[in-house]
């Protein structure tokens, strides 16, 4: 209770508070702590305890479509994503979606899906700011997609998306986009992380020497 009271007093006084722990969510009292600028909270928690003072709320969306999000066990529906964003906008918060470009299995249709939900958000939300930050998928050792072949198709799909965004009536100063890493820089990062050659990464199926885990499907 003392920690809760102290945190609330500091936040109400305009202080920036961060909870430091190896795993803050393991503590039984975590759910009762006041939300801070930096933290991970459910919409239900924020509705009950109030929004943090931060002007922007970041959402780790991952895939550019609902189909891709389900494939990586993060089944955020379009309705929930748009609804949550609209609610935050209505409460004076700008929102940033963090998305991964080039998840395994990504197609042109997934990016069309993203265009559609951006248009829906714009139609349903007369006031508010939405930013989209893209990160290029990069394999890491000991992860489920570590052995998937590296594919640069995401970059062409992003360029098409960017052209759509800036070239016509779809453009809006209420929507901001930050591009993912280009293929060359993504490749360098993957080679360093995985300890594999470009040929091995593009062929796929190779287990990283930096990995301590062996997946049965690799």
Where are these regions (language model features)?
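Conserved SAM/AdoMet-binding glycine-rich loop
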Residues: 1-131, 139
């Amino acid at each position: 209770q003392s920690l809760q009271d102290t945190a609330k007093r500091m936040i109400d006084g305009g202080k920036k508070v961060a909870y430091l722990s190896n795993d803050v969510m393991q503590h039984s009292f975590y759910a009762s702590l006041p939300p801070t600028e930096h933290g991970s909270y459910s919409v239900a928690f924020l509705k009950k305890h109030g929004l943090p003072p931060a002007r922007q709320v970041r959402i780790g969306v991952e895939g550019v479509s609902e189909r891709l999000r389900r494939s990586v066990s993060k089944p955020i529906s379009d309705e929930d994503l748009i609804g949550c964003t609209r609610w935050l906008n209505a409460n004076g918060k700008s929102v940033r979606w963090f998305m991964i470009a080039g998840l395994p299995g990504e197609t042109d249709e997934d990016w069309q899906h993203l265009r559609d939900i951006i248009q829906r958000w714009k139609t349903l939300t007369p006031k508010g700011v939405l930013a989209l930050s893209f990160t290029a998928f990069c394999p890491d050792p000991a992860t489920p997609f570590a052995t998937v072949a590296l594919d640069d198709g995401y970059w062409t799909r992003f360029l098409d998306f960017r052209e759509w965004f800036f070239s016509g009536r779809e453009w809006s100063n209420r929507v901001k986009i930050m591009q993912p890493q280009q293929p060359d820089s993504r490749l360098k990062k993957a080679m360093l992380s995985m300890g594999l050659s470009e040929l091995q990464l593009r062929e796929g199926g190779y287990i990283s020497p930096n990995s301590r885990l062996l997946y049965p499907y690799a």
